[in-house]
């Protein structure tokens, strides 16, 4: 797999240039000025070549390609669907558009709010962006989650620029789909500025049984779908998954220098409890604890990287959830929990396992709570009814995973026409 890290490559180039000079000093090599100048020129050319190559290999996001989408936005009333992740370098998309005299009339904000600091599921009121004065229309204000007719009449085109993590129960894509539906209904255009999927290198999990459709499961896709938001938007249109089989007028600005084997490391945490790549990689396996009494580390420095409960026994690791920004009232608040720390697992081991239900099975068997362990939210997260049944029957994680293997292969074939990037 290709790991995309431009800063690392640039640092290596600088170090290479310094090492050339140090070699001569360390070995007391005396060269006349002409030879030294030629050697330094050669080193400069080589370093410049390596730097150009590093720049060519760097993933270029959709929002960075302003020459591609500025003409589309000319003379349009613009709404954006974004949050704190919608950055172009050190500036937000909103600021870039306003600096270039575009008419931004509204911001639609997802779960966690426009600034990305609200708790999971917390109601966030609509407001006004203090810096720019642009109205923020919250999709998580406790109402329908779909924008009103009045808000839809304000703009001509919706620009989507938000970092997703590629999981069916991560809510940003569901908010995007609701906006696509509204845009289809009111004949508004949609422009997705695509971003890499940090979990885009594999597909895993059961396809959602649509009787469990909810805010944490909006489409008939596996838990780990392996698609970018741009690809997913194209699939929503192509498969006519919007209500009443509607389609919207959709344009996608794809990333450059990106494939589904590019392991893209996010420069900004996408939400308060996914603070780093380890949390993002373990999220597909540990999120199910949200539907149990077990703590998954909210209120600690290791959210989604640990799990435990005050009554779990036989473990050497323990932690105590606290009230912190982004997790004001976490499960098992203030209680000493005993359990497992997964944060020391290598990324490679996590990728090899994919979705690993052994953690949930371990806690279920240890606590011996039977029907009191799972809440109905579990089916909304996993997307089917057979997983809970198989766990209660004593089946292993491998046996359960074998059950959804056909779902994974079916979806890979179904999604293929909509992929923008090499698998």
Label each region the model flagged:
Residues 116-121, 191-213:
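Glycine-rich, charge-decorated loop segments at or immediately adjacent to ligand/cofactor-binding or catalytic sites
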Residues 125-155:
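Glycine-rich oxoanion-binding loops at beta->alpha junctions
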Residues 1-57:
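Bacterial Sec-dependent N-terminal signal peptides
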Residues 256-333:
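Glycine-rich, aromatic-lined ligand/substrate-binding cores of catalytic
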Residues 105-111, 193:
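Short internal beta-strands
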Residues 213-283:
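Conserved anion/nucleotide-ligand pocket segment
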Residues 303, 307-405, 423:
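Conserved functional hotspot residues or short segments at active or partner-binding sites
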Residues 164-176:
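Glycine/threonine-rich flexible loop motifs
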